[in-house]
Amino acid sequence: MNWSNLCAEVNGFIDLFFPPACLLCHAPRGESPDPSLCTHCLGGFLPLTSPCCPRCALPFATIGGGDHVCGECLLQPPAFSWTTAAGLYEETLRHAIHRFKFDGCLVLDRPLARLLDTAWQRTAPNWTPDLIVPVPLHPRRLSQRTYNQALLIARELGRSRQIPVDAQLLVRVRPTVAQAGLTARERHRNLLGAFALTRPLSGEKILLVDDVMTTGTTARICATALHGEGAGEVGVAVLARARRNSLLGLETTLSREVEEIGG
């Protein structure tokens, strides 16, 4: 018996008496197809389905009809070409992101990145970026949280796709107030000039990665900054997308979450 077979048998014996637990709810994973999450938690993730806007992934309230560009993207086209999301910012996915982002449950980076990778493959199967770039935190916020959740997801995507991740390309050059509770215009004013690039680009395709997209203001500002320094096509990948009709409740929740981490 070789070493790999022996390890497999030992692991199987351990699993028999100590079944692997779900990283999110800690229940036995059972026959789940995911190596980290149980079937119950996987079933609680609400996928982003048609109809939605292919540019910003905004879900539409109507059931019928296909995907089409939303009114905001028609009137003010963003500097990114498309957006993909692992699911809606509701129920289990919302809880998972909260655990990952605010409770320090960093082991969720890989299962969440797998979900996002699957969504990316579905949205843009033939699109490969030259660089994966996470939305940065301001150094002050980074010192409070000690990690950038967008960077952790970006690294997992880069590892699985063999694509370089550049965490120093896009930086936040000034602190901003919390976005929660701000109107779209206030959000834009709050973030305008907050991001800069550390070097020029030469037409590289960029995948911009963030955790949650609410109004899309952050992605718009970042993509504009990337294009301003010579980036080629920019795509956006987020763990979750908020519904427009749920933004009011989302703002209230995010306000509380921001207070929990000290503003």
Spans of model-derived segments:
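Glycine-rich phosphate/pyrophosphate-handling loop used in enzymes and phosphotransfer proteins
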Residues: M1-V209, T214-G263
